[in-house]
């Protein structure tokens, strides 16, 4: 499903806390630090369980705790995460690991504890999961379901091992196949004749790229089937599906 706001580059409201802006192609391709933030902002509880499955730890951190751990332990990570929030929110934040809270709208240098902590806009453990899903949405990814609470640790570890096996199989299949890299996708869009060129394609939202490719493929399949019918193909075997439909939708 294509989100029209993200397609046109408009932000999504995250409750009454902040707006989350869809990054552009330039944002993603020209900023290695943001790639790190993307992984950190989107990591799921299941992925953390998979990472810690063979480690003897008393408790596996939540995605929010994992973010704070990275910020607290590494100054470079702290700078990168602040940069990532600025790019997504278009406003500064202050991260306070000791209080387990992210204050929106003020940088560390600007924050006045006497004035800005009365009714602050914050991201914390209570709303971080929902914030992550908004981030996933502006990046063109699918939101995830909340993790199962109070699940038996043995069941969690068993599920983690199954996912590890599935990833290994997927990697083997990927090596045999020929995946299309992002550069090839944006080059293909520049050849569609819709006004996008290497000079301006960096201005569209990052999430648009697979959507434009998908719509183009649907249109191409429809055109091929129509031409085949005009050339005398068997109508029972060639049944054009109209291309203006939601991506992956069967009609």
Show the residue positions of the predicted features.
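An amphipathic, hydrophobic-aromatic interaction surface with interspersed Lys/Arg
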Residues: 1-62, 66, 70, 130-225
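General structural signal for secondary-structure boundaries
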Residues: 21-24, 77, 205-206, 238-243
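Extended, charge-biased low-complexity segments
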Residues: 57-86, 94
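Long amphipathic alpha-helical segments with strong coiled-coil/leucine-zipper propensity
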Residues: 80-166
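Short N-terminal micro-motifs specific to bacterial/archaeal maturation
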Residues: 122-125, 192, 200, 234
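Long, intrinsically disordered, low-complexity Ser/Thr/Pro-rich regulatory/activation regions
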Residues: 229-251
């Amino acid at each position: 499903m294509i989100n029209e706001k993200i397609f046109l580059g408009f932000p999504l409201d995250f409750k009454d806390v902040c707006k989350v802006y869809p990054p552009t192609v330039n944002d993603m391709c020209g900023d290695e630090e943001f790639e790190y933030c993307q992984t950190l902002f989107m990591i799921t509880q299941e992925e953390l369980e998979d990472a810690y499955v063979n480690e003897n730890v008393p408790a596996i951190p939540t995605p929010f705790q994992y973010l704070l751990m990275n910020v607290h332990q590494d100054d470079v990570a702290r700078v990168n995460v602040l940069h990532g929030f600025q790019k997504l929110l278009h406003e500064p934040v202050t991260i306070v690991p000791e209080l387990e809270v992210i204050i929106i709208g003020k940088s560390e240098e600007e924050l006045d504890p006497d004035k800005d902590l009365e009714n602050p806009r914050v991201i914390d453990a209570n709303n971080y999961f929902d914030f992550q899903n908004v981030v996933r949405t502006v990046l063109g990814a699918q939101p995830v379901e909340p993790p199962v609470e109070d699940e038996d640790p043995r069941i969690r570890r068993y599920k983690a091992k199954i996912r590890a096996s599935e990833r290994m199989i997927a990697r083997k299949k990927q090596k045999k196949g020929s995946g299309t890299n992002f550069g090839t996708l944006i080059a293909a869009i520049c050849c569609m004749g819709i006004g996008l060129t290497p000079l301006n394609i960096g201005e569209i939202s990052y999430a648009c790229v697979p959507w434009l490719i998908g719509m183009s493929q649907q249109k191409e399949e429809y055109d091929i089937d129509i031409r085949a019918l005009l050339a005398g193909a068997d109508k029972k075997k060639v049944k054009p599906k109209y291309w203006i439909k939601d991506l992956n939708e069967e009609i």
